[in-house]
From Swiss-Prot:
UniProt-recorded Gene Ontology molecular function terms: ATP binding; FMN adenylyltransferase activity
Organism: Aciduliprofundum boonei (strain DSM 19572 / T469)
Reactions it catalyzes: FMN + ATP + H(+) = FAD + diphosphate
Protein residues bound to ATP: V9, F10, H14, P15, G16, H17, D93, Y120
Known function: Catalyzes the transfer of the AMP portion of ATP to flavin mononucleotide (FMN) to produce flavin adenine dinucleotide (FAD) coenzyme.
Record-given protein name: FAD synthase
Lineage of source species: Archaea, Methanobacteriati, Thermoplasmatota, DHVE2 group, Candidatus Aciduliprofundum
Superkingdom of the organism of origin: Archaea
Length: 149
């Protein structure tokens, strides 16, 4: 059985996330998704809109996903040690170096192949920031009726 591991924030689920997870699932028999902890997201990106438990629940509810787990708070490789994947899948925009991941895993006794997926689609809803900006741009239109009531 080939176990695939994918990782991400998954703050506001969008079509890009679904496509990423579908493609990751095709690479093996089981897909385990690691959802970044709130503290990790705040340190590396921004304060998440959805908390880690909600994000994990949402991801685990997706059809391609067999299991979703929260990442380790201090050491991402501890999660890799727990999951023991055969393949780690990276999205086109994830800022990790494939060779560095493979080397660190090798040092920890884990033989893993790291695969970076290509960009898929170019929808204006294929990114959390794009969705947030679209909502902000349209908030007046969306709630104008409520304000006038």
């Amino acid at each position: 059985m080939v176990r695939v591991m994918a990782t991400g924030v998954f703050d506001i689920l969008h079509p890009g996330h679904v496509l990423f997870l579908r493609e990751a699932r095709k690479l093996g028999d089981e897909l385990v998704v690691v959802v970044a902890r709130d503290s990790t997201v705040e340190r590396l990106k921004h304060k998440p809109i959805m908390n880690e438990d909600i994000r994990r629940f949402m991801v685990e509810s997706l059809k391609p996903v067999d299991r979703a787990v929260l990442g380790h708070k201090d050491d991402m490789y501890k999660t890799v040690e727990d999951v023991r994947p055969d393949i780690i899948v990276l999205g086109y925009d994830q800022k990790f170096d494939e060779k560095e991941i493979e080397e660190e895993c090798r040092k920890r006794g884990i033989k893993v192949k790291v695969v970076r997926l290509k960009k898929y689609g170019d929808s204006d809803l294929n990114g959390t920031r794009k969705i947030i900006f679209k909502i902000v741009d349209r908030v007046d239109d969306l709630y104008a009726k409520d304000r006038n009531s």
